[in-house]
Amino acid sequence: DQKLDTATFYDKPYAYEVKKNKKREVKANILKMSLITKVVKAQGDTQSIVFDGKTPVVVINANEQEYDTKTGIMTATGTVTIKYKDLDTFSDKAKVRTDKNGDLKDIELIGNARIKQESNDSYADRFYYSAATKVLTATGNTTSKAIMDDGATLVLKANRQEYAQDRNIFNASGN
């Protein structure tokens, strides 16, 4: 009594999901869909795009991506790049969590992580951003370079840095 549990698609397949006004699509060399666990795995030259209406909001590229349709967790591994509005991120691994409507809950960048926004650049072992609190936390070997209003460059090195986006406040601790 054998049951088919995984569907595998080759030759650069494409899949998408629509929730309310948001569309999430994935392209890769190979797509695997578990019919039991409802997990989609993209392998080789993967790209995911989240649209709000017809506007691309987030573009994620990685060697491999896995999306659990039940939990709303997407895990990308291997040379991960994420483009979100005017923000570019780079890391070895990323986890993106969304709610049932497809809205961002949080994002985690793990390993050789970098965030670049305009002329500001931050590096850390790990970044964590909560959409609810609008707080970005960087931990492990953190370095931030920011260009001030007067043109001066600020370099901040610490073991932990925290940026409260809605209050525009930086906190740093540890050496």
Model-derived regions: residue spans:
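Mature-chain termini and adjacent capping regions
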Residues: 1-175
